[in-house]
A protein has these predicted regions:
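A conserved ligand/cofactor-binding region detector
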Residues: 1-404
Length: 404
């Protein structure tokens, strides 16, 4: 699972498996009985330890526990993810079988996500790093560091990025008729739509920028084109509302002459790998802003950085290791880190309503959600989720207002 959220640790109804997979059910019972006897012996009959680790319990088959029982290795996909698995999600299993747990941080294929999708940058690297040496020995990319002050190489890098932006803008214009401002920074967030990934936090920041521009026409602001791409799970109503919100904000900004050539928001439809291959080389800022402790790793963060985009992110998932690799001077880190976020959530003392009442900037942004964006749609439901919670969950479950 590439998140530590409980919803990703599947639990199947026992009756479903009994009815449709009777032979598998017989095998599961035997595995479960043997495993539960071993757990009972190890924990001296302590049900507070045995029950959470059981495979079949309370009429459910717990798939993650089945995997823990059966697997030779349990592999975290970032250093932080592995630590959370051992410390929290499977802490008793780790205490019993520590040798099972290991870490191999996710990675990407640089031949696909650099050489193939960014041919101009590939040509520059070949000129600087021994032709195609880096394709087989990716550590050869470190040879680029010697050119950090080379005016010719830096100029060529800038031109490559400009060319890629123009190529992507031309493709978007052909596909959708939307004209991107290639003189603005391309600030990109593309990934599965989920509340913990905090596309909503990004939108709230855009609303703030819009309000700031309207209040002060001389606001010194580097022109920015925000690009979103995401798909929501079919039954995930909140995620679909956030997509609608992104489009409402985009339409409002597109209608406002004051935003022309300064601020733009575009939702890229049908985000997919073939689109990503065009987008990554053109991107300049990469939004990796999940709530600390919720993202297992992420690979988009790696694809963006490999194509020269700077990361704006939290210390979550593989961002932690990217930060260690590139140094704090080459990445924009903000927000709570995992221990602080976990402690605040566990304390029950997080009160987003107090933030709303005491922070005039956040107050204005959320009031805009309630008023809407000139298209006849209001987002009171999203404001209520942030301030009051919903569906049995706490207010602002993923602490967007805290990290705003």
């Amino acid at each position: 699972n590439h998140t530590v959220l409980a919803e990703a640790l599947e639990r199947w109804p026992q009756q479903l498996i009994e009815k449709w997979l009777p032979r598998i059910w017989q095998i599961l019972i035997e595995i479960s009985n043997r495993y539960q006897r071993a757990l009972t012996d190890y924990f001296h009959g302590d049900l507070s330890k045995v029950a959470p680790m059981a495979i079949i319990w309370g009429g459910e088959v717990r798939m993650a526990n089945l995997c823990v029982c059966a697997c030779f290795k349990i592999n975290g996909v970032s250093a932080l993810h592995s630590d959370i698995l051992k410390r929290d999600v499977f802490h008793d299993a780790y205490a019993r079988t520590p040798d099972k747990f290991t870490n191999v941080t996710n990675g990407i294929d640089h031949r696909r996500w650099l050489s193939e999708c960014n041919p101009e940058l590939d040509a520059l690297i070949r000129d600087c790093c021994g032709k195609d040496k880096y394709l087989l020995q990716p550590d050869a990319l470190k040879e680029l560091e010697q050119y950090r002050d080379d005016a010719g190489v830096l100029s060529r890098l800038g031109q490559i990025k400009a060319d890629n932006k123009k190529a992507f803008a031309a493709w978007v214009a052909r596909e959708s008729g939307v004209i991107l401002n290639t003189d603005a920074l391309f600030d990109v967030q593309v990934k599965r739509l989920h509340e913990y990934k905090r596309q909503l936090l990004n939108v709230l920041h855009i609303i703030y920028l819009y309000q700031r521009m309207k209040a002060d026409p001389h606001f010194d602001f580097t022109p920015r084109t925000y690009l979103f791409g995401a798909k929501a799970a079919p039954g995930y109503a909140v995620a679909k509302r956030i997509i609608r919100l992104i489009n409402s904000v985009a339409d409002m900004i597109a209608r406002d002459p004051a935003c022309k050539d300064r601020l733009q928001v575009v939702f890229l439809e049908n985000y997919r790998v073939s689109l990503a291959e065009k987008l990554m080389p053109a991107s300049e800022l990469s939004e990796q802003i999940s709530t600390a402790g919720k993202e297992a790793s992420g690979t988009g963060n790696m694809k963006f950085m490999m194509n020269g985009a700077l990361t704006i992110g939290t210390m979550d998932g593989a961002n932690v290791e990217i930060c260690e690799a590139v140094g704090r001077d080459n990445i924009f880190i903000f927000g709570m880190e995992t221990p602080e976020a976990e402690a605040l959530a566990a304390s029950g003392n997080y009160e987003p309503m107090l933030i709303y009442q005491n922070d005039p900037v956040i107050h204005r942004v959320l009031d805009q959600l309630i008023r809407g964006f000139g298209d006849g749609v209001d987002y009171t439901d999203i404001a209520n989720l942030l301030l009051h919670g919903g569906n049995g969950g706490p207010a602002d479950r993923y602490m967007s207002l805290k990290d705003f």
